[in-house]
Amino acid sequence: MYAEFYGLKELPFALTPDPRFIYFTPSHTEVMANLHYGIESGKGLVVVTGEVGTGKTTILRWMMERLDRTVLVAYIFNPRLSVPEFYQHVSTLLDVQKWETKSELLLELGRALESRHSRGLRTVLIVDEAQGLSPHVLEEIRLLSNFESNTAKQLQIVLTGQPELREVLNNPDLRQLKQRIALRCVIKPLPNVEETDRYITSRLLVAGAERTDIFAPESVDFIFRCSDGIPRNINNLCDNALLAGYAAGDATIGRSIIEDVADTFDMLPRAQRMPSSEERAEPAQIFSSASRAELWNAGKNTGDTD
């Protein structure tokens, strides 16, 4: 809708995790280096955490698209699985077919991993949104981490999730799994206005923008403040701001448009937020209740009953 108006070939701020639009902050670069190192060197279990919207899934998809063909990846993005469902997913994704019981599956999986490892091939199991895994499934993941040769792990495991994943792994019942974590990575939000400006410019250029000053400097500053530096929040603000700017016929997105959008999505900095209707009504309700109580007491003291 607004793409042609702003000279864009496609929408630059879609919320889908399109690897083409990935922007590497120093934090993203560090996480990618750790993931690459963990997989290449056969470290075993890698844990990646980050706030909602910081780009965990985008990084995973970008990495999977660029892994060597010798790497077989099993990617599980639904953590709400029972143990049988989890193993069904693993067996399907890793092409292990002849099994009926868990012990048979583990035996066949071990043979398949050993065969691949002996031929110089690597196998990676990635579980996204892992903070939602049950303790029972996490214990099974610990068992899968036992597949190893004398020199390296035969199955690389990557768990990604929100910061709550760290709390889940601190469960005393999962201490054996926690002890097997070889690498921990944290994806951080964009740290400042300058990085936010580079992020916005990068996405505009990927979308075919002919000009990079669509967002005025003061609007970028306010976007950073409203978004807390989280890419998904930035995308949401920018996408809706471009739509509002198009509707208003504004070639440049100023701060006022960002303020309106942020207010609509309840993303204004706390100091600028208007109280909700309930909050605005609360003092009046308190006063009204107090007044009724005072009037009732006054009537009781004077003997009025009407």
Task: Give residue ranges: language-model regions.
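Mid-core helix/loop region of P-loop NTP-binding domains shared across ATPases and GTPases
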Residues: 82-85, 98-140, 149-152, 194-196, ...
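Conserved AAA+ ATPase "SRH/arginine-finger" region at the nucleotide-binding site
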Residues: 76-80, 168-172, 182-195
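Walker A/P-loop nucleotide-binding motif
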Residues: 41-63
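Conserved small helical "lid"/interfacial subdomain of P-loop NTPases
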Residues: 189-216
